[in-house]
């Protein structure tokens, strides 16, 4: 067996990007969960990848491991994601990738373990890492399940996305609502354009709330998403982004907008819906618990102790 070699690059070439994408697909099929986030997948192809660095581990010119390092911004640490080809596991590749990205990312760097699978836990224990952040995936059924009635208060106007004319307000509220969030809070027009170009994008699934007396200043929005059927897995809806402006908190808009999206997804014939929420976001967890969501799996960001 030949020794594998690691190398860093600021941008994957066309063949590397295709090989990494195929590796990620194999890892997803083997593990039942994607090893790299949506934002990370975009960065593989070079989209929205300012400052992102890529680490590939090759064996006889074949990519057997991949890691991606998102740079730190302000108070937010560098974040890494990685995957090992299922056919090359059990050779220490995952541990080497983790050690290298943490070294390159600086003392506060973190590495995601999506699904927190046993192999990832074993690597973390071996390297003396601790869980520094949790991202929970919650799910609830839609088919044959009751949903509360959608009642829009008289002082609120609810409508769907009309196009790029709405983007400035969407970005303003998103940045304010997720100022604490290292990935979501940094969205720009580029991120919106990338997602509008996706096959799943449907403007009628992006709900926007305004004061009835002011239809220019957005209070909050809920962007839904539909994941298509994959193999034996049926299509599933997602509460993709719920953002409420800080000046509109405490008015029940999170529940209202979430419920509007759930009715929309159910009306599209979807049997279930998922969402992601930070493990320490007690307010959001309370809202989703009341709407019938239950924990499905957990992503953990590991850091040095």
Curated annotation (Swiss-Prot):
Sites where the protein binds 1D-myo-inositol 2-(L-cysteinylamino)-2-deoxy-alpha-D-glucopyranoside: 38, 183, 225, 238, 276
The UniProt entry, under Pfam families, shows:
Acetyltransf_1
Q: Where does acetyl-CoA 1 bind?
A: 82-84
Question: Where is each N-acetyltransferase domain found?
Answer: 10-153, 156-305
Question: Per the similarity annotation, which family is this?
Answer: Belongs to the acetyltransferase family. MshD subfamily.
Q: What does this protein do?
A: Catalyzes the transfer of acetyl from acetyl-CoA to desacetylmycothiol (Cys-GlcN-Ins) to form mycothiol.
Q: Could you say which EC number(s) this protein's record lists? A: 2.3.1.189
Q: What is this protein called?
A: Mycothiol acetyltransferase
- Report quaternary structure and partners: Monomer.
Reaction catalysed by this enzyme:
1D-myo-inositol 2-(L-cysteinylamino)-2-deoxy-alpha-D-glucopyranoside + acetyl-CoA = mycothiol + CoA + H(+)
Q: Which CDD domains match?
A: NAT_SF (cd04301)
Write down the superkingdom of origin: Bacteria
Which GO-annotated molecular functions does the record name? Answer: mycothiol synthase activity; protein-N-terminal-alanine acetyltransferase activity
Task: Specify the enzyme's EC class, one word.
Answer: transferase
Keyword list, A-Z: Acyltransferase, Repeat, Transferase
Which GO terms are recorded in the biological process aspect for this UniProt protein?
mycothiol biosynthetic process
Which residues bind acetyl-CoA 2 per the record? 242-244, 249-255, 281-286
Entry-linked InterPro entries: Acyl_CoA_acyltransferase, GNAT_dom, MshD_Acetyltransferase, Mycothiol_AcTrfase
């Amino acid at each position: 067996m030949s020794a594998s070699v690691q190398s860093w690059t600021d941008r994957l070439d066309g063949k590397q990007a295709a090989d990494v994408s195929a590796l990620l697909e194999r890892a997803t099929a083997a593990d039942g969960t994607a090893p790299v986030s949506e934002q990370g997948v975009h960065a593989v192809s070079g989209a929205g990848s300012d400052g992102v660095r890529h680490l590939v581990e090759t064996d006889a010119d074949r990519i057997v491991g991949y890691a991606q390092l998102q740079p730190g911004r302000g108070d937010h640490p560098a974040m890494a994601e990685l995957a090992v080809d299922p056919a090359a596991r059990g050779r220490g590749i995952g541990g080497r990738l983790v050690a290298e990205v943490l070294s390159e990312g600086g003392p506060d760097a973190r590495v995601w373990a999506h699904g927190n699978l046993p192999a990832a836990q074993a690597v973390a224990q071996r390297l003396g890492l601790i869980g520094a952040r949790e991202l929970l995936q919650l799910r609830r059924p839609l088919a044959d399940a009751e949903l509360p009635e959608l009642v829009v208060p008289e002082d609120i106007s609810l409508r769907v996305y009309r196009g790029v004319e709405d983007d400035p307000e969407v970005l303003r509220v998103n940045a304010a609502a997720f100022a604490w969030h290292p990935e979501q809070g940094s969205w720009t027009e580029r991120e919106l354009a990338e997602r509008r170009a996706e096959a799943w994008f449907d403007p009628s699934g992006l709900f926007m709330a305004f004061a009835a007396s002011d239809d220019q200043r957005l209070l909050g929005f809920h962007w839904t998403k539909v994941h298509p059927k994959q193999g034996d897995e049926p299509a599933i809806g997602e509460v993709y982004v719920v953002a409420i402006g800080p000046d509109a908190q405490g008015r029940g808009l999170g529940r209202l907008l979430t419920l509007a999206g759930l009715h929309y997804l159910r009306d599209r014939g979807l049997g279930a819906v998922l969402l992601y929420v930070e493990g320490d976001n007690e307010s959001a967890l309370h809202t989703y618990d009341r709407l019938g969501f239950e924990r499905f799996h957990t992503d953990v960001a590991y850091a040095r102790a």
